[in-house]
Amino acid sequence: MLSATEVRHSHRRRRSPYSDKQHYQEYLLQRIEGYKNSIGRDELLRLGDEAASELQATSEGQFVLTEVLMLESVDRLIVKRLSLRPYSRWRKQFLRLRAAQRTPNHWGIDALCPLSALLPRIEPEDSALVVGTGAAPMTFLLAAHDAAVTFLADNLGCVERVESRMAEEALASLFESYVTQLEHPLPLFMSFLKGFDLVVLDPGVLKGMSAANRGELVRDLQQRSRPGGIHVILPSSKALSPNILRPLYEGWTPEEELKRRRRADSKGPHGLVLCKPTCPPDTA
């Protein structure tokens, strides 16, 4: 993830964005795998038999059938069966769609949302952790900017809806989601979730918690951020203002983007955008 200074002084990215060809291959793969998962085993076997017959008819005994050839042939049959668009036609629609997906209002997000100001800083495959049902729309916006997004919520229905729309919008290639209780630090089996460039928190998940439990969960999320990582606290909960959480971020610095937006627009709710220290205070 680029710093604000890097964005101001250079438009050069450290990582190249995905090419349209890569996005097209992901589009095909998602549709093919979705179709395979939607049909029964018998139908899948019949599809395999059809692919084998087609290969044998066209090969004239020139090669031995292999698993790779069979899989490729099955995939081609599925592409034909689903009438998936060729690259040239797909690209025209994709460019328009992706341009729309990268705007906050496409997802019903306020243009003054604290995350919006950070979008120019996001690079392909930056890792983002989004926590809470009230932050669900942020998952789509981040995925549209090619971030690798992990979504956590304690509501199974919400997680399933996000997963479904990610697939519908062709944004699921770098997306993961988990259902977990958010009343304490994350469970041990989620210890692999760490090193995030960006964490987006719906403070609604902290509503009703004791001050001690609230602090434990926030500190746990802080530890999962890389040095210099960003935390965005959304103004999504009427019951819990983001500013109430500010004392839990001792040593973290407010980002300039939100300061400027606050000066430009004094009305309406504001969130918090905070940057983790690049080194512990005692070694600074």
What is each PLM-predicted segment?
Residues 124-134:
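Conserved class I S-adenosyl-L-methionine
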Residues 239-284:
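Class I S-adenosyl-L-methionine
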